[in-house]
UniProtKB/Swiss-Prot annotation:
Family: Belongs to the universal ribosomal protein uL16 family.
Gene: rplP
Molecular function GO terms recorded: rRNA binding; structural constituent of ribosome; tRNA binding
PROSITE patterns on file: RIBOSOMAL_L16_1 (PS00586), RIBOSOMAL_L16_2 (PS00701)
Gene Ontology process terms (BP): translation
Name of the protein this chain belongs to: Large ribosomal subunit protein uL16
UniProt subunit comment: Part of the 50S ribosomal subunit.
UniProt keyword Ribosomal protein present: yes
Protein function: Binds 23S rRNA and is also seen to make contacts with the A and possibly P site tRNAs.
Recorded GO CC terms: cytosolic large ribosomal subunit
InterPro entries: Ribosomal_uL16, Ribosomal_uL16_bact-type, Ribosomal_uL16_CS, Ribosomal_uL16_dom, Ribosomal_uL16_sf
Keywords: Ribonucleoprotein, Ribosomal protein, RNA-binding, rRNA-binding, tRNA-binding
Length: 136
């Protein structure tokens, strides 16, 4: 699963997920899966969607993952009283704003790409849409 090799600090503030996304265009492949909603994707969700797409295209074409989980989420154990410091890092998330391209695919027909992205979208907690590369 995806997570940073090393970070400057182990734990992070909760913060807010506001603003608009960068990386809104299909840059590498021909088709993309773009986020319509706002939220956060865990490393497990990113990997589950990648596996669903890979199975659908049966190793033809190429898939690019455009998001990386770089924010640590901490949790305190069950039945532990409040206080006594911040909990341990349990998983990593990527914050997603509307318009962000999450995955890209190239070297496959459009119908196959649509089907693969549909399977991947079912694994994700945010609303997504299918986009194609725009040539200026």
């Amino acid at each position: 699963m995806l997570q940073p090799k090393r970070t400057k600090f182990r734990k992070m503030h909760k913060g807010r997920n506001r603003g608009l996304a960068q990386g809104t265009d299909v840059s590498f492949g021909s088709f993309g899966l773009k986020a319509v909603g706002r939220g956060r994707l865990t490393a497990r969700q990113i990997e589950a969607a990648r596996r669903a797409m890979t199975r659908a295209v049966k190793r033809q074409g190429k898939i690019w993952i455009r998001v990386f989980p770089d924010k640590p989420i901490t949790e305190k154990p069950l039945a532990v009283r409040m206080g006594k410091g911040k909990g341990n890092v349990e998983y990593w998330v990527a914050l997603i704003q509307p318009g962000k391209v999450l995955y890209e695919m190239g070297g496959v027909p459009e119908e196959l790409a649509r089907e693969a992205f549909k399977l991947a979208a079912a694994k994700l907690p945010i609303k997504t849409t299918f986009v194609t590369k725009t040539v200026m």
